[in-house]
């Protein structure tokens, strides 16, 4: 069982559900390591977006409100930080603000950038998992430490029946190391 293979298997599993749509930068074109895990996902399920993180999170919330399960891909934490307003004040709070009337189940995929073979500097390798856990009251944050953790996390994120969103945090270095 390899980390990258499990990520690919997870994306293919998610794509089998007619409610899922994948959106973000470099989802339908090469550009990030995450792009390589989406190669077998049907192209009509991939929505390529410009670098506009807050817009992407707003679209994610909108798709979730319609009953879709968006898989919103932010290649590293530093991209997701730019969508923090939409994440914390909208996606995370809609269920609470509507007294349970609206559920916004989304899967947010992000990563801790690779440090090897060359360290790209702190902007790309930050891990904000704990900070986001403290900011969000309804979104679960799962960090994928081992290959055996990958598929169950994505399966849970899709099949959970509580209407909650899940942020799944990957390690860039593990794509080729584990």
Model-derived features: where do they sit?
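Thiamine diphosphate
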Residues: 1-178
């Amino acid at each position: 069982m390899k980390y990258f293979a499990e990520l690919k298997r997870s994306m293919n599993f998610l794509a089998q559900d007619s409610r899922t749509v994948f959106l973000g930068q470099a989802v339908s074109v090469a550009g990030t390591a995450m792009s390589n895990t989406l190669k077998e996902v049907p192209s009509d399920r991939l929505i390529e977006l410009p670098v506009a993180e807050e817009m992407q999170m707003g679209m994610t919330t909108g798709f979730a409100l319609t009953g879709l399960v968006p898989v919103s891909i932010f290649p590293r934490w530093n991209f997701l930080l730019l969508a923090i307003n939409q994440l914390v004040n909208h996606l995370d709070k809609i269920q609470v603000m509507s007294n349970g009337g609206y559920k916004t189940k989304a899967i947010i995929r992000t990563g801790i950038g690779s440090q090897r073979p060359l360290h790209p500097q702190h902007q790309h390798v930050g891990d904000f998992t704990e900070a986001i856990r403290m900011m969000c009251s309804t979104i679960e944050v799962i960090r994928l430490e081992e290959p055996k953790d990958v598929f169950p996390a994505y399966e849970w994120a899709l099949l959970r029946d509580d209407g909650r969103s899940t942020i799944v945090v990957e390690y860039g270095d593990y794509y080729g190391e584990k």
